[in-house]
Amino acid sequence: MALTEQKRVRLEKLSDENGIISALAFDQRGALKRLMVKHQTEEPTVAQMEELKVLVADELTKYASSMLLDPEYGLPATKALDEKAGLLLAYEKTGYDTTSTKRLPDCLDVWSAKRIKEEGADAVKFLLYYDVDSSDELNQEKQAYIERIGSECVAEDIPFFLEILAYDEKIADAGSVEYAKVKPHKVIGAMKVFSDPRFNIDVLKVEVPVNIKYVEGFAEGEVVYTREEAAAFFKAQDEATNLPYIYLSAGVSAKLFQDTLVFAHESGANFNGVLCGRATWAGSVEAYIKDGEAAARECVRTTGFENIDELNKVLQRTATSWKERV
């Protein structure tokens, strides 16, 4: 992958001195609202969502290499970032049409790569739901959509992070044993597709290739993969792309995510960092709603800091520099 000078400078801003991306994700919108309504009866307000993002940015970006936010509720938080932290902004609308299995991509209406760059972002992030076994017609539509965003990012000379969430059109429950059995094929297959230079993607943000809760030694119930099988899937995922790639935390606990990274490294996965969200800050939501901003800050300073500090220690032992892949 040939990086322009501007893209390289921006990727360096997003990573630490070792070329590892230890990014904090708080671009959640729908997921954040769902977390909030567990603790309050009224609809979450814009002010509440903005304030939560600001306090997390303010308290934790001094320990992260960068932060991912959304332009809908996250712009005030972009002003609270530590001066050394890079900024990614999400370009996609939250969620997808649940009346269809297509999960078509959709950009935020009043945003563009140009506007994201003007807001001070060092990268554009876009989330795509992709089923490698969907019809060619549907997947060509999705691929063309990603080509457009890639071309925008080339025009603006800004890095393009594509987040791929694999799924199966015929399996509704992504946490099921049924989906766990096909997940490696879905995740690795999608990575292969979007590693093609035609998409102009600079970094892939991906799921781990297995549901770790069904791996021997991690599983509390049914085992779908032996440790050897799971390790082989991590290795196959690494070999599926020549692009830098980082793992998303997918809402699992901080400890399970850290253990997963160690397992990935031991399996031969040369991943280049993480974009970790709920595993770091989820506890602050309840504190914020029940006891206010000061309580939420205290939660972030203690539990949130511990989570990010432990994660950083694990990353230094397990992740590799993105510069080795470009």
Swiss-Prot record:
UniProt entry keywords in alphabetical sequence: Lactose metabolism, Lyase
Keyword Lyase part of the UniProt annotation: yes
GO BP annotations listed: 6-sulfoquinovose(1-) catabolic process; D-tagatose 6-phosphate catabolic process; lactose catabolic process via tagatose-6-phosphate
Known EC number: 4.1.2.40
Reaction(s) the record says it catalyses: D-tagatofuranose 1,6-bisphosphate = D-glyceraldehyde 3-phosphate + dihydroxyacetone phosphate
Pathway: Carbohydrate metabolism; D-tagatose 6-phosphate degradation; D-glyceraldehyde 3-phosphate and glycerone phosphate from D-tagatose 6-phosphate: step 2/2
Family: Belongs to the aldolase LacD family.
PANTHER family the UniProt entry points to: SULFOFRUCTOSEPHOSPHATE ALDOLASE
HAMAP family on file: LacD
Name this protein carries in UniProt: Tagatose 1,6-diphosphate aldolase
Gene: lacD
